[in-house]
C-alpha cells in the first residue's frame, strides 16, 4: 500500500486458540501495533470433537459448553474494542488460508501450544500460508515464565520437577501486557462475515447432557466460561486466600480451622481458577501479579514465612509450567528456543 507511510502490514490475522483473552495477549497486541487492520479468528476444528480411538469423547459436553462461553465472551470483548471475532467450523489450515486470501493478509499472529496434535496443526497452517506469501509470527503466553528467560535450552530441561524448580528459582516473571483499549478494525477487503458460534449439537454433542451442569458442579458452583468471569474469580480468589491461609495455619498448629472452608491445598480450592487458566481466559502472569499485590496480607495471615498463599500459588504455577515445558520438550522435534522469538520490550517484575 503506497499510502501506508508507517510501514504497517495491510492486514493481519490473529489466530486464537487456548488464549481466549484480551489481557496479556502478545499476539493480539503485536498484530494491532504492526497492522493497518486485524482479523481475529477462532476455528472449531472438527478433529477435536467426536470419538477417540478408545471410544471416548475427545471433547466432552461440559468442556465444550465452557469453551463456547469462553469464545462468546472473547467476541464481546473484541467488539467492545472496535473489532470482532471471526468464527469458523473447519480445519484451521483450510479456514485460515481462505480468510487470508479473502482479506489480503500478509501475517498470521499466534501463540504456540505444547501438545503434538497442536504443534502439527501449527505446522500445517504455517506451511499452507507460506505458500500464499503469508508470514507466521509465533508468540508464547501460556506459562508463568517465558521460555526465553529460562536458564537452559528446552532440550536440556531437567526431566524432574525438583531439578526444574531449582534452576528457575531466580528467574523473573515478565510483566503482563495490558489489554488494548481500542483495536484496529476488520479488513475492508473480502467482506468477511463474523459467522455464528456453533451449538453443542452442531459440534456433535448432546446438549441435554451439558445442561445438567445447571444443577451442581464441583465445589457447589456453576462454571461459566470467559475472561470476564475469570477476572471476577481471580478477584474473589485473592480475597479468599488470606482467610484460607489463616485457617490452614491454625490447622497445622493444632487449632480447629474456623469456617469449615475448603483447604487451601486441596483440589476444591485449586479448581476454583484452573478451568480458566486452561482455556487461556486468565494469564498465569496476571494471576501472579494480582496476588503479589496482596503479599503483605498473605504474610500477615500466617506466622510461617515460608508457608503463605503467594508461595503456594507460585508452587502450583511452577508445576503447571513444568508440565507444559516438559510436554513441549518431548512432543516436538522443533526446539522452542528456535521457534519463539525473544521480546526485549517486555520487562520483568
Language-model region placement:
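Trp/Phe/Arg-rich N-terminal binding region typifying the photolyase-homology
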Residues: 1-188
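Glycine/tryptophan-enriched, flexible segments
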Residues: 8, 156-347
